[in-house]
Swiss-Prot record:
Quaternary context: Homotrimer.
Family: Belongs to the aspartate/ornithine carbamoyltransferase superfamily. PTCase family.
Reaction catalysis annotation: carbamoyl phosphate + putrescine = N-carbamoylputrescine + phosphate + H(+)
Pfam families linked to this entry: OTCace (PF00185), OTCace_N (PF02729)
Example of a GO biological process term: citrulline biosynthetic process
Binding site for carbamoyl phosphate: 54-58, 105, 132
Protein name, per record: Putrescine carbamoyltransferase
Subcellular location: Cytoplasm
UniProt pathway: Amine and polyamine biosynthesis; putrescine biosynthesis via agmatine pathway; putrescine from N-carbamoylputrescine (transferase route): step 1/1
Organism: Listeria monocytogenes serovar 1/2a (strain ATCC BAA-679 / EGD-e)
GO CC terms of this entry: cytoplasm
Keyword tRNA-binding among UniProt keywords: no
Keyword field: Cytoplasm, Polyamine biosynthesis, Transferase
Length: 341
């Protein structure tokens, strides 16, 4: 019997497995844009646990399940006994008998880890205080769609501007997994921690990528292909007032036209959204032709479809790359013939 796998952290997957997920997502995106909805998840049910509110995560997962023939069950805060009257472990065991896969967006990373360790079904991390792996996958798809002409992903540099949020950490995890050069341009005290850098170092040893943490804007932005930012209050929301946040990050770490001009001419701007206009990014940048933030939001759906198929379709129950290649051929044929409509 094959060991159950979960999507808690991309460090648990090889570069080849991540690239395969990306390819599944891109092929299904193309198929659906052409009006073909492969029913790969027919009769499957996703249970969605939310300790935090969400727009993109909830809508993306629900839409993905519907498009592929399945059903999503929303479990809102206060509607289930997660960690309250009922333990996290007991909740996981019960839901394992009722649904086929779980997604959890939680306040503490340990909660989703405990769900995964106890559940008999796959568990997907929809975001925790440590990382945001589904965002990682959607962002990777977006970068592949917007690669500079003549460049491979391994040739690209991505710069994260600002606070060391879980999205910043996840951006580094994915970039170094893919062999990219990653830079965090942020102030001391708000830079990625040693536990994050250890993962990046391990990734780079395998992929040939690199990482750098700096307060020097010119070093950070030189030849950047992608610039990414997030809100300024991620992990430190309870520690800093709005006035203190602005004093720490503004204006040096605001993504504006001047900062963009220091990057490569073909640079693309990324943001996980929602954005606080006028703080971490100006309207001029967020709405610019080089901004790909709406593509990113759409590719959350692309990523969710890929993950759900990867973990629930029988061809990829075992995630070895040989199986991935076999399923790749099956999916190619299915999409070409428009089967399952």
């Amino acid at each position: 019997m094959n060991k159950k796998r979960d999507f808690i952290d991309t460090k648990d997957f090889s570069k080849e497995e991540i690239l395969f997920m990306i390819e599944i997502g891109r092929k299904m995106k193309e198929s659906i844009k052409n009006g073909h909805y492969p029913q790969l998840l027919k009769h499957k049910t996703l249970g969605m646990i939310f300790e935090q509110s969400s727009t993109r995560t909830r809508v993306s997962f629900e839409t993905a399940m519907t498009q592929l023939g399945g059903h999503a069950q929303y479990l809102a805060p206060g509607q289930i006994q997660l960690g309250g009257h009922e333990s996290v472990g007991d909740t996981a065991k019960v839901l394992s008998r009722l649904v086929d896969i779980l997604m959890a967006r939680v306040e503490r990373h340990q909660t989703v880890v405990e769900l995964a360790n106890t559940a008999a079904i796959p568990v997907i991390n929809g975001m925790s205080d440590y990382n945001h792996p589904t965002q990682e996958l959607g962002d990777a798809i977006t970068m592949f769609e917007h690669l500079p002409k003549g460049k491979k992903i391994e040739d690209c540099k991505i710069v994260f501007v600002g606070d060391a949020t879980q999205v910043c950490a996840s951006t580094m995890f994915m970039a170094t997994k893919l062999g990219m050069d990653f830079v965090q341009f942020g102030p001391k005290g708000f830079q990625l921690r040693e536990e994050h850098l250890k993962v990046a170092e391990e990734n780079c040893e395998v992929s040939g990528g690199s990482y750098l943490i700096t307060e020097d804007v010119d070093i950070a932005l030189k030849d950047a292909d992608f610039i990414y930012t997030d809100v300024w209050y991620g992990l430190y929301e309870a520690e800093l007032s709005e006035e203190e946040r602005m004093k720490t990050f503004y204006p040096k770490y605001q993504v504006n036209k001047e900062l963009i001009s220091k990057a490569a001419p073909h640079v693309k701007f990324m943001h996980c959204l929602p954005a606080t206009r006028g703080e971490e990014v100006t309207d001029e940048v967020l709405d610019a032709p080089y901004s790909v933030v709406i593509d990113e939001a759409e590719n959350r759906l692309t990523a969710m479809r890929a993950l759900l198929v990867y973990f629930m379709n029988p061809y990829v129950k075992e995630a070895g790359f040989a199986v991935a290649e076999k399923y790749d051929a099956e999916l190619e044929l299915l999409l070409r013939n428009g089967a399952g409509l």
